[in-house]
């Protein structure tokens, strides 16, 4: 058998790795020759594209559909087409193998180095016009594959028809397919390093099918979203930030069939509600395409594709635009820490551990049965860092909350001795993950300066919110998991025992300025048997609601930005269920308990946003001062929040069901004070005890201060007071 025949056999068996060396137009010793792989075709002609005339009929040298022939009277390459007959129908098509290399040298170098700012502009499927021909350019990184083909609705999912060109410089396979349009489904069929056939979704796909289907969808790269100063300022350390954490699939559902709301329906309903409640930001639990509903999106396989559960990519873009139009900033939960091992995804992508660490002690996450990204690989770092910029630049996302940072930066996270591999210094830190986070945050700081990143980091790793050039990780904010844990532990105690655990509410101020903190009451606190926030409060019904209201009042006044998971704003009684709507019926009673909590959260948000003392100096010690810190017996706390002009808000909390009458508190500024917030108000279904009118200070020393106020502190309540002008 000749080498030419062997090459043809390899093409049809799908094992020919260099199709451009054989197919298309070539200068041979015989002259200008055209060769075409057209499985099952009956006949083929070369057509001059400039005038539509047939020049020469190609010979079918292999009955399976391989054609070749010499072009008479031509010495130079020209724009040709193929007129192909299948079953008595003739089609004039462009030959994808007449186009030259697609990736430029600079792109190849940057992608191999892992520093391409926007890898999504070069990899994946892109609608383009080349040499006057409309089509789609495909590119995928699979350096160890023996052959990669584009398959889809446009070629009967036949891997023989469109094998790709390998760019050996960086292991990227590329191909331009004429007349392939937006809306068509595709995948990559490859023969991996072991000779096995794999069918993979595109890691850089901008849209995908809804589960259980797994194909990628050709979609235009979204246009860039311009930033504006208002959105930038809303993210700043000196601004009020109150975040409403939302799972789009269960915030609200259709009552007739329990089906999800679409992005458009969410835009119509969620935005009005968020505005009414006074939240400044919405944080969306992961909307990247993911195969398993029960993962809540935290096991994504389509990092560049908004999930189709609620609509198209353009629908999601319109949803974000609508939020911005309403003055609401949008944060996304982002999961660069791990990915599921589904066959069609990133796992063993080209037959090797390409995206993941090869050693399971590094690359397997036993808590979640997922795989861990290999942060030391340049192309993987580029894939993830580019994705962060993609959401900010192409969808206008205002920030990313990075999930499970501790699991990324510690090699021994949730592992016993012998189950992890030390770094090259012998330590437990994952230096590659740390370098990745620093690189990503540094890159975003330059490329998307209006956006922010927030870390869910559950350890005391130092410098999470310090800049990378100061040896920090470079985040803008860090979730204060310690505050959340300590305060919830305190609130779950019977009030009679709280005096023995007084320091649970005071300890947080010892480290409050070590990072830029967000106070999170997230979805993690209302699942897996932890019970709802309301159900965790002690006492009878009245005490449960009073405890929760007092806690919210304390939280909104405490230094740090705020985050509350959906349903907690009206004290949902059961744990969160991702398969059902929130219990909105609890609000049907106009004067009910749940309405009271909802009204309180709304008032807290609106007052917080108009009172700079509660947010302007969140991360500076002069913005906070304890007044009463040691009254264990009465479980009373009092502190001052202060703005840059020295204006003060006095905050007093009583965490026992015993009202405190005639309670004296030393103050800094003598004069008349007025109660502006009382979580025990009748408006919130409280007992309506408190302080009416102006309360004048007395020149009576207390708490190391010359002047003091005498207050009535309601049971299980938090008060805010301000000095009269």
Swiss-Prot record:
Catalytic activity field: Transfers a segment of a (1->4)-alpha-D-glucan chain to a primary hydroxy group in a similar glucan chain
GO CC terms, sorted: cytosol
GO molecular function: 1,4-alpha-glucan branching enzyme activity; cation binding; hydrolase activity, hydrolyzing O-glycosyl compounds
EC number: 2.4.1.18
Keyword Iron-sulfur: no
Active site: 403, 456
InterPro entries: A-amylase/branching_C (IPR006048), Branching_enzy (IPR037439), GlgB (IPR006407), GlgB_N (IPR054169), GlgB_N_E_set_prok (IPR044143), Glyco_hydro_13_cat_dom (IPR006047), Glyco_hydro_13_N (IPR004193), Glyco_hydro_b (IPR013780)
Pathway membership: Glycan biosynthesis; glycogen biosynthesis
NCBIfam families, sorted: branching_enzym, PRK05402.1, PRK12313.1
Function field: Catalyzes the formation of the alpha-1,6-glucosidic linkages in glycogen by scission of a 1,4-alpha-linked oligosaccharide from growing alpha-1,4-glucan chains and the subsequent attachment of the oligosaccharide to the alpha-1,6 position.
The protein's assembly and partners: Monomer.
Entry protein name: 1,4-alpha-glucan branching enzyme GlgB
Protein source organism: Pectobacterium atrosepticum (strain SCRI 1043 / ATCC BAA-672)
